C-alpha cells in the first residue's frame, strides 16, 4: 500500500470509528459491533473505499498484540502457575471437544477429512480481542468466570503453534516440505527470547528510566512490543503470544504501571482498527449465494461452543448465574481462523468456496456475540432483580431511594452499610453477578446491571434520589457515569471514589467536588500514628494530619493538568516549604502537657 493510500485509509478508519461507535452506543449495541458495522460500510462489499483488506487485517492485529501485552503485565509467573489447571484442563478440553464435534459436522458437509480437522480447530478458537473487550465492559475480568475465560483464551493462543505445524502434515507434504530442523531452530529461538527477556528487560528499562524523559520510555515500550511481535511472526508463531510473554516477564518489575500507561492509548485505537478490518473482510457475495448454509453454520457454531463451554463451566464449579456469560462471551470464531485457513488454503486443503464460507461464518459469529451478551444481560437482570419467595427481608426498602450506590466492592460495601445503619433508603447497583448473588443471600438488596445505562439508572430510582455515590473500579466507568448523571439527572448530588490524583483531577474538571481518594485517608491515619510512635504528642500529630490534608487538597485543585510540568514542580516545592513552615510554627506556639489530650477520647 502506497504512502498516500495508507494516509487515506487511516483517515477513513478514524472517520468510521468516530461516526459509528457513538451511533452504536446510542442504539445500545456496543462499541465492538459498531466497529464491525463500520468496517462493512467502508469495505469492498460496502462503499468500496478500501479494497486491500488482507494487508490492513494483518496490520490491525497489532491491537490484539498491545492488548495481550497489557494482560501479561497484570499476571506474574506465580499467578500463571496458579491458573495451570484451568489453562491446560478447561482450555484444552474446550478446544478438543469443540474441534472434534465441528470437524465431524464439516465432514458431513462434504469437506475432506483433512480440511474438516483444520476447519474444526479453527472454528473452536475464540476471538481474544472481542472476548477480552466484552469481559472488561461487563465487569467479568474480576469474576471467577472471567478468570476461567482468560485461561481458555490463553490456551487457545498456545494451541496456535501445534495447529499451524499440523497443516502440512494433513496436506500430505510432511516428508517433502516439513523441515524438522527449522522447527528445532524456532524452538531454540523462542527459548533464547524467554531467557534473554528474563535477565535483560529490567536492566534495559532501568537505564532508559534513568534518562527521566517520558517520551523515550514510551518509545522503548513500543519498541519492545513491536519487536516481540515481529520476532514471533518471523518464527511463524502467534504475535500476541510473544507480547503476552514479554508482559509477564515485566509483571513483577517496578515499571509495570508506567508501561501500562504508555501502551494503553495505542491499544484502544488499534483494537478498533482490528474490528473494523474484520468487518471489511466479510464477503457479502458468498453470504448472498449461500445464505441458508451460512446462517445455519453460524447458529450451529455458536450453539455447539456455548454448550461445550457451559458444560465445562459447570464441571469446574462456576456459579450457575455466571455460566451463561462465560459460555456466550467465548462462543464466536476468532481471528486465528483467518491465519489457519489461509495456511490450509496455500496447502490446497480446501475445495471451491469452502474457505470463503468458513471465513464468513467466523465473521458473522463475531457479530452475534455483542447481541448475545446484551440479551443474556437482560435475562440475568430479570432473573436476579425480580422478587423471589425465599428472599430475606431487605435492610431497607428500595422504593424511592434517597441514595443510589454504584458498585458493591470493598469500598462500596462500607458506604452502603453506613447508610443502611442510619436508616437511609438506598439502591445498590453492581455488575459482578457473583457479588450480587452473595450479597443478596445476606439480605442486601443489590441489583444486577450496568449502571452506565440510563434506563437502568432510571429504574433504580435516580430521578427520585437525592444523591448518587459512584464507587466503580474502572476510572473510565466513573467518568462516564458522572457525565451521564450530569446530562440526565442534573439534580443528583454526585459523590465519587477516586483511585488517585489523576482521577481526582478529572473529577474536579468535570465539576465533581465531593470525592474521596481511596488510599489517602488511611495513609494519613497511619502517618499520624507513626508520628505518635516517634514521640510527637497525639494532639500535635492530629493537627499535623489536618494541616497536611487541607494543604494537599488545595494543591490538588491548583495543580491541574493544564499547567506545564515545570510550573507543577515549582508549585509543589512551594507547597512543601509552606507545610514545613506551618509545622515549625505549631511546634513553637504550642507547649501542651503530654497528658493533656488523649487521642482515644
Curated annotation (Swiss-Prot):
Pfam families reported in the protein's UniProt record: Na_H_Exchanger, TrkA_N
InterPro entries xref list: Cation/H_exchanger_TM (IPR006153), K/H_exchanger (IPR004771), K_H_efflux_KefB (IPR020884), K_uptake_TrkA (IPR006036), Na+/solute_symporter_sf (IPR038770), NAD(P)-bd_dom_sf (IPR036291), RCK_N (IPR003148)
Compartment(s) where it occurs, according to its Swiss-Prot or TrEMBL record: Cell inner membrane
GO biological process terms on file: proton transmembrane transport
Membrane topology: Multi-pass membrane protein
RCK N-terminal domain location: 400-519
Primary location group: membrane
Top-level taxon in the UniProt lineage: Bacteria
GO molecular function: glutathione-regulated potassium exporter activity
UniProt-listed PROSITE patterns: RCK_N
Membrane-traversing stretches: 4-24, 29-49, 55-75, 87-107, 111-131, 152-172, 177-197, 207-227, 230-250, 262-282, 284-304, 324-344, 356-376
Record's keyword terms, sorted: Antiport, Cell inner membrane, Cell membrane, Ion transport, Membrane, Potassium, Potassium transport, Transmembrane, Transmembrane helix, Transport
GO cellular component, one term: plasma membrane
UniProt cross-references to NCBIfam families, sorted A to Z: 2a37, PRK03659.1
Family: Belongs to the monovalent cation:proton antiporter 2 (CPA2) transporter (TC 2.A.37) family. KefB subfamily.
Assembly with partners or alone: Interacts with the regulatory subunit KefG.
Function as written in the Swiss-Prot or TrEMBL entry: Pore-forming subunit of a potassium efflux system that confers protection against electrophiles. Catalyzes K(+)/H(+) antiport.
Record protein name field: Glutathione-regulated potassium-efflux system protein KefB
Lineage: Bacteria, Pseudomonadati, Pseudomonadota, Gammaproteobacteria, Enterobacterales
